[in-house]
Design a protein with these regions (language model features):
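Long compositionally biased, domain-poor regions of proteins
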Residues: 1-5, 10-174
Length: 174
């Protein structure tokens, strides 16, 4: 199992913060070619978000996720639309089952801790729920739940595509 650590996420975030618009555009062009189904689905769903900042959050989160996995493996096989739909539907049903009586933080933490990439999923949740900031989330409760499931699906599929080797991303390597 490959693990993306908090240090690796911080390192990738630091790199993104120092990119200009042309560099970010080039990265996004590469993403669109490498993972068209994932990028298309996530960005397509983000168009439905009510708040522009939420759409920016989605693009930022997806950038961190895709760059994190690119650090593990340069040429990740593309996720197909069928793979995404099947995985997303299964994930959505599982989350509905777990949270059918409402949100329970203990259940949520258990899901994150047992996930294939717990620190990456925790990062996603922190951005979506705006943890650590005094401001409220840019997402409605329904939007937040949907995008947690979407990103959990994206992470799980990319994790699967990068193979079973045990490795940690070393941010000092970058």
């Amino acid at each position: 199992m490959t693990r993306i650590t908090e240090d690796a996420i911080d390192s990738i975030n630091h790199r993104i913060q120092h990119m200009d618009e042309d560099q970010i555009g080039k990265v996004w062009d590469e993403f669109a070619k490498e993972q068209p189904a994932l990028v298309g689905y996530v960005l397509g769903e983000s168009r439905e978000l009510k708040v522009a900042d939420a759409r920016e959050d989605v693009a930022y989160i997806l950038t961190i996720i895709l760059l994190s996995f690119r650090e593990l493996q340069q040429h990740i096989p593309a996720v197909t639309e069928e793979e995404f739909e099947k995985s997303f539907n299964a994930e959505f049903e599982e989350m509905e089952e777990v949270f059918h009586d409402g949100f329970d933080e203990t259940d949520a933490m258990e899901i994150m801790d047992s996930f294939c990439q717990p620190e990456l999923l925790q990062f996603v949740a922190a951005i979506i729920y705006n943890e650590g900031d005094d401001e409220s989330s840019n997402f409605t409760e329904e939007e937040a739940g949907l995008f947690i499931v979407i990103f959990k699906t994206v992470i799980a599929l990319l994790h699967e595509k990068t193979g079973p080797q045990v490795r940690y991303i070393d941010p000092r390597r970058q």
